[in-house]
Amino acid sequence: MVWFVYGEECNVEAQDVDLCACGCWLNDRLLAFYMAWLQHRCRAPVLCLGPATTFWIALADVDTLRGGLSRLEMADKELLILPINNNPYGDRPGGTHWSLLVCHVPTKTFHSLDSAAPMNEECARNVAHKMAQLLRWREGEGEVEVHPVSCPQQKNGADCGVFVLLYA
């Protein structure tokens, strides 16, 4: 049974709502729903990407991404908001932590908000590197600087998704 529907591809079911109970992890569908809602509220010049898109950015090659993401016109935005997960697998569920990466397009800078810093540092840097290439700020290899933002830290192993919603 679908409880909430937002847009054509974003819905939340009863089993997802149950995850909002204390001590449970938020799943991809809840984060996607919130990012879609936030995108609707923010409008341009902010682009809130969902977990699936960010995961694809982390795993795919830049040429494939350019073709698939060109319609988003990311270079024309002011802020890009990306939820980051540390799942290293492209073919199955996984991952144990969410954080948030914010790209400020006018200054070509990346900022990471991690409630269990520096747990997702490498994952955020990987996505930032791909984003810099997608936005044509740099080509090839080379370090992309991601500025860690001082932010509240979680006190348990389950609240990272809630913190991502808060930071976004």
Q: Which role fits each region the language model picked out?
A:
Residues M1-S99, C103-F110:
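Cysteine protease catalytic domains with a Cys-His-Asp triad
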Residues D63-A168:
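Cysteine protease-like catalytic core of ubiquitin/ubiquitin-like
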